[in-house]
Amino acid sequence: MSITAQSVYRDTGNFFRNQFMTILLVSLLCAFITVVLGHVFSPSDAQLAQLNDGVPVSGSSGLFDLVQNMSPEQQQILLQASAASTFSGLIGNAILAGGVILIIQLVSAGQRVSALRAIGASAPILPKLFILIFLTTLLVQIGIMLVVVPGIIMAILLALAPVMLVQDKMGVFASMRSSMRLTWANMRLVAPAVLSWLLAKTLLLLFASSFAALTPEIGAVLANTLSNLISAVLLIYLFRLYMLIRQ
C-alpha cells in the first residue's frame, strides 16, 4: 500500500482535534511536573545570584571560557542548575510520550480515555522511556555540538523509537536500532515531520521570554505546555505512520 504524507497529516489533524482536550490536559500536567521538578532541584535564588559575582562576562570569548573564569562553588551551582533543568525536562518528556501514545492506543481500542488514565496506564513503561529519551537527547546534543547536521540526522533516525518501544514492547536499544532501519527506509515520510517539529520548537524558544511577562512560573508552564502540544502532534503523526508502514 502506498503511503502519502498528506494522508498521514490528515489523520493526525483529525485525531488531534477529536482528542484535543485530553491531549491538552496531558501537556499541561507534564508542563506543570517539569516546572515543579525544576524548581525543587534548582539552586536557590541566592545561589543563582552568586553566578554573576566576579565573573567577567564581557571579557569571555565563549561558554567554556566563561565557566573557567568561575570559582569552584559557582561551577557547582551552574552544574546543579543544568542538571535540574535536564532531569525535569526528561521526566516531563517521558510522561508526555507515554501519555500521548497510551491515548492513541486506548482510543484505537474503542475505550474511553482521560488524561490521568493515560498517564497512569503509561507508568510501567516510563522507566524505559526515560532511558530512551535520555540516550536520544544525548546523541542529538553531541551531534549538534559537532556540526549541527549529525544531530538533526540522529533526531530523524531515532524519531520512531518511542512508538516502537511502547507499541511493540521493545527494549531501549532494540527500539533505537529498529527506528534507524525503518526511518532510513521511509526518510521522505519521517524527515519533513521531524524537521517541522524542530523548527516549531526553535521558534517557540525564540519567543519563550515573552511568556515571562506574566510571572516566571506561569510563563514557564505556558511555554512548556505549547512545547508539549507540538511534540504531541509529532507523536501522533509518527504513531499513525508506523501503523501504516507495518500493514
Curated annotation (Swiss-Prot):
Its main location: membrane. It is a multi-pass membrane protein. The keyword Transmembrane helix applies. The chain crosses the membrane at residues 20-40, 87-107, 118-140, 152-172, 187-209, 225-245. One of its GO terms (cellular component) is plasma membrane. Keywords: Cell inner membrane, Cell membrane, Membrane, Transmembrane, Transmembrane helix. Pfam families: UPF0259. The keyword Cell membrane applies. It is found in: Cell inner membrane. Belongs to the UPF0259 family. NCBIfam families: PRK02868.1 (NF002774). This is UPF0259 membrane protein YciC. It comes from Escherichia coli O1:K1 / APEC. The gene is yciC.
